[in-house]
């Protein structure tokens, strides 16, 4: 969230190999400075990457999965976690739309508003600390823009405000998981 406070700075956060190529090429050619935040957890991910020249526009989200009951908004490595949760929710009869922001600034307000107006529910999931995280900006904006469409309060999922451990089990314990997203989604649907 810190970088989003700097006027004129673009903040790119890819979640797939194809987006990594498209956003990086766009960043190289951009007139504005770009902070390119590549999550180390995505380095081993394999996926289709187009051979042709692809420049992804900043500020345009990707709908990773369509759904009608609730909206899950995320970025970077947490998008895959949201997709896992959406599969679990689907088995329970809950249809979740997953939105990958791709850039935190500018961020695609219109895509998120359109989805929340359709579903009436929003969960924002990210790895950063929930307090002061970019999820709070999304929640505030959508709370204002979609107030009359919301069926439940907006839910923010992130890390607790504690030091991050170097021990993998302790690090995993504070990360947003597919299970925590599923639990929050079920509560939102109740």
PLM region descriptions:
Residues 1-30, 189:
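Conserved thiamine diphosphate
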Residues 40-190:
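Thiamine diphosphate
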Residues 27, 31-33, 138-142:
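Glycine- and acidic-residue-enriched helix-capping/beta->alpha junction motif
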């Amino acid at each position: 969230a810190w970088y989003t406070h700097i006027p004129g700075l673009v903040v790119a956060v890819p979640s797939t190999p194809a987006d990594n190529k498209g956003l990086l090429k766009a960043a190289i050619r951009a007139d504005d400075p770009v902070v390119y935040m590549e999550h180390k957890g995505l380095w081993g991910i394999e996926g289709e990457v187009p051979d042709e020249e692809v420049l992804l526009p900043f500020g345009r989200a990707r709908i990773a999965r369509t759904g009608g009951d609730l909206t899950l908004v995320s970025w970077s490595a947490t998008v895959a976690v949201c997709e896992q949760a959406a599969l679990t929710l689907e088995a329970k009869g809950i249809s979740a739309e997953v939105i990958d922001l791709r850039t935190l600034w500018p961020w695609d307000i219109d895509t998120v508003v359109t989805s929340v107006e359709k579903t009436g529910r929003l969960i924002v999931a990210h790895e950063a600390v929930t307090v002061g995280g970019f999820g709070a900006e999304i929640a505030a904006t959508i709370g204002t823009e979609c107030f009359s469409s919301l069926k439940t309060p907006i839910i923010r999922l992130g890390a607790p405000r504690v030091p991050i451990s170097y021990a993998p089990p302790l690090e995993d314990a504070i990360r947003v998981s597919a299970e925590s997203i599923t639990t929050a989604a079920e509560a939102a649907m109740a």
